[in-house]
């Protein structure tokens, strides 16, 4: 499998330094992608870089994932208009361990193969590096003129950020350049890959290697992922879509991919899955014949959810989706954990009832008309119940005055009322 050709048909090449393809054709290459460790989970904004490493390893090359412990303590001017918070070492090590666990779902760290993946942290070689070392081994090789010419620096200096550009952030490209030099010298790493906004920082590294060692190193960047409508990829109203289920439930994760537009699904299935070209071309053709069936979105959501979470989590997410949009049973509803239940019914009207009152038993008509405004009147409710149009926890309400107790609660806390086909209400016992 040819790595560059694989990335090209997937739309994952933005810039590539001349000679990169020739290098990859003649030897097993070691390359790295940098990962920001400011959180203890990756989010889907990291996935393009991770998938590049995955394809790289599948093509027989050796991937390094570099945790930017030292650089993460500083900040990067290439895309952030504001400086980042600093990390302490304990937090950094915790975040690193969590991130490696997530990366292990994409990369082989464990085998004895010569191209097994490695995780490195630039804090390990920067923490003892003095300012005098830095000035002598890095600073003297790169001119300020060279640094000022970088697009990311120009933007900050030209007033895009009110606070200007600190010296710390200005030197970021030298620190990242030194990472490349260090990995070149210690790991034989000849290629750095990253998002297109990193081109300036990466080429500082190739320049540093050339000027200090007379060595040849290379750069490859992928496009920044966008949405067809111009919106920011990977962000929702509630923030990032995280890989850690503590921050984004598998159900919400699955729903994110399921709900992308047709145009985005066609691009994302190439970038975020390992499906081969023939299969993806077949899926696109099938989708174009019947877009309303959302074949691409369903397959994309399945592949990414299984890869990041598990087959079991994927099946649970599908079942949860069917509760809202299909003919699910009360048994399926009862299987939902509290987080998924709340995620599925996010935004539906909510009402509260006293747990004590419910323990004694409350007639449905009193609960749904007087306590919770599910119905405007008892007459309206009676008519709908008689027509089989009212359900409690996905079971048809048997009678207008059916008694509801704490035994009916889901997760010992919730009652789900459905009026007609599409109107849901959540009653919370407190």
Curated annotation (Swiss-Prot):
Q: Which residues bind ATP?
A: 235
One GO molecular function term?
tyrosine-tRNA ligase activity
Q: What class of enzyme is it?
A: ligase
Gene3D superfamilies assigned:
HUPs, RNA-binding S4 domain, Tyrosyl-Transfer RNA Synthetase
**Domain S4 RNA-binding residues, every copy:** 362-429
- Where can the motif 'KMSKS' region be found? 232-236
Tell me the GO BP annotations in alphabetical order: tyrosyl-tRNA aminoacylation
**One GO location term (cellular component):** cytosol
Subcellular location as annotated: Cytoplasm
Q: Where is this motif: 'HIGH' region?
A: 37-46
Which residues does L-tyrosine bind?
Answer: 32, 172, 176
The UniProt catalytic activity note for this protein reads: tRNA(Tyr) + L-tyrosine + ATP = L-tyrosyl-tRNA(Tyr) + AMP + diphosphate + H(+)
* Leader peptide range in chain numbering: none
- Claim: Ligase is one of the keywords in the record: yes
Keywords of this entry:
Aminoacyl-tRNA synthetase, ATP-binding, Cytoplasm, Ligase, Nucleotide-binding, Protein biosynthesis, RNA-binding
Q: Has UniProt tagged this entry with the keyword RNA-binding?
A: yes
The EC number(s) attached to this protein equal 6.1.1.1
Its main subcellular localisation, reduced to a broad class, is: cytoplasm
Q: How does it assemble?
A: Homodimer.
Its biological purpose is as follows:
Catalyzes the attachment of tyrosine to tRNA(Tyr) in a two-step reaction: tyrosine is first activated by ATP to form Tyr-AMP and then transferred to the acceptor end of tRNA(Tyr).
User: What family does this belong to?
Assistant: Belongs to the class-I aminoacyl-tRNA synthetase family. TyrS type 1 subfamily.
Q: Per its record, how is this protein called by name? A: Tyrosine--tRNA ligase
Q: Which organism is it from?
A: Bacteroides fragilis (strain ATCC 25285 / DSM 2151 / CCUG 4856 / JCM 11019 / LMG 10263 / NCTC 9343 / Onslow / VPI 2553 / EN-2)
Lineage of the organism: Bacteria, Pseudomonadati, Bacteroidota, Bacteroidia, Bacteroidales
